[in-house]
Amino acid sequence: MINQQAHEKMIKARSKLMKGQLGMASMLLHLDLVEVSADQCSTMATDGKRIIYNPQFVLDIEEIEVQSVLVHEALHVVWEHPLRRGKRHHKVWNIACDYAINGFLIYDLGFELPEGGLWDRNYMGMSSEVIYRELITNEEALQDAIDTMNEGNEESNEGSGESGEESGEGESDQESGGESPDTGDQESEDSAPVGKPEQSMTGKYFSSPDEKTGEKVGDIDLDSIPMPSGEVWDAQDDEGKPLSESEITELQQEIQRAVSLADKLEKAMSCDGTSSMGGRMDTLKEVKVDWKDQLNDFL
């Protein structure tokens, strides 16, 4: 039986987004709300088809924070993060995805990040793939992210003991570090609301020689680092299995249709005919790939 109070809070938060964030609200209407236990997810997550949430997390935060995390998850779907991890380490990938979207969440959509939320001006305009490469090859940069998350966890868990994420709990089966499904020839990149856009590494050749997909970055044990609030999970089917190539293509098409509809709704309702979808429709039409990544595809 679901927690009715938490479910109603989620519905209410989503409904209120219709007033100021029509595009994001439209995206969220395409995602089923699924309640799970704390040992499956300690905060909130998305796999591209669902919004998965821990009811206690929803009850413990303010409604405006629920809205912020919901939009955060919607942005993961807009930029197809559940389909783009490849062989990258799932925790570092989550951190990279958060850095990629949170600047847009703050500056373009006007939301505040919860304690421990990841944002760094140096990453503005970079894709998740480029940020991942920086984190996986730069121990200091990765440690900065870990410190930010730990500070947030300490404040939010003050007086309530250690969180599930820090103690190794609160991870789904797929978060044990396996590979996400092959995304075929998928190409997609995050938008760049501020600064010079960096090129995106996309497609099926995710693991390149300079990415170090091992278990450590310097002295940092990758499996021991915390997960950020508002996770991105690999896309999966109803049985929790990796998607087939045809299912990946189908989900991509579903997401692109949802983004197109959200973009049109925002433009129709805005005074100046613009949309806050972060230029996502433009990136669907014209994708650029870093020459280094193209070269690595053949090495």
Regions found by a protein language model. Name each.
Residues M1-L70, A74-F111, G117:
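Basic/hydrophobic alpha-helical interface regions
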Residues G103-L299:
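Negatively charged
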